[in-house]
Amino acid sequence: MATGPFTLLGRRHELTFGAMMSDQKADDRETGFVFTPTSIGDFYRWTGAYPEPDWASTPYALTKTHVKQSGAYGAVRWNLATPLKLIVGARLSNYEVDQGTFHFKQTAKFLPYAGVVYDIDDTYSAYASYTTIFNPQTYRDRNGNVLAPTSGKNAEIGLKGAFLDGRLNASVALFDAWLDNVAQTDTGHYLPDGSLAYYAASDTRSKGIELDIQGEWLPGWNVYAGASQFTASNGDGSRLNSQIPRATVRLFTTYRLPGAWHRLTVGGGVNWQSRFSQSALGPNGPVQVGQGAYAIASLMARYDVTSNASVAINVNNLFDKRYYTMTGFYNQALYGEPRNVMVTLSYRM
């Protein structure tokens, strides 16, 4: 990558350009649920012991995958006027995946993007951006083939503010994305190794809002807060990516005590998220399993022993909330961490 300034029409602008290339090969040996299950008896009395399968006689599937990527990119940051900046750029991408029975190749994929920033005054600035999207992925369909890259476009507008001489910053953004080949769980279908199969959803749309504020709003008192809300749907209007919570809120604050206690900083926060769900295969067919909305609180304290050394204690999941971080994957649910305490000693050279 190279970056440098240049002058045109009496104004100073900036040019950036570069290139990348990667070549990846992988051999995957996959074994499904081919051995005979052994009864464990009463589940509540099970000790976890289970006889080891006869791996030598277990058949497997060998998949060879070869992925090649290359591309070049460039962008110009135009200084159109004192309060107005325009960024125009593009990326040219080549992508190829060869998996024996499956082959996909995309040559010279042109991906333009543009953005504009306008400084309304010394406090506020507004911006807008447009980006084309092309993201290779490794998800596989029920036949074991890698899904084609996700492609589409994203538009965003926002407003940023810098307050208290730049010590406190806030922003709000609205986004709208249209994507094709978005990986979705193919309920009831699995790969030979037992992992979930996926299908590519097309004509999808995702839109939402993000708010963020962080910085020192009073001497020694810092705040970090944010919230987001989005919707996502298929072309037919059905819910998309239900395993991702639609709304999240996070708040954390720290305060450095004044006077003789100035070496001590205390803080706390809370993270909240809305419900999420995912398909799982039950005895009577596919079902939706999920986790309701929940909040996790935390506390911290840090003491600066010297200008270079400090000791900190963090208490996570303060109220020992029991919750799931994932549901449905391999027809199972994973608990989040219970209440835990971590002590850290840090030293800066």
Residues covered by each model-derived region:
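Surface-exposed extracellular loop regions of Gram-negative outer-membrane beta-barrel proteins
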Residues: M1-P5, V67-G100, K109-N135, I213-A227
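Conserved C-terminal beta-signal and adjacent last beta-strands/turns
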Residues: L15, S242-M349
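Transmembrane beta-strands of outer-membrane beta-barrel pores
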Residues: A19-D27, L92-E96, Y130-P136, F163, ...
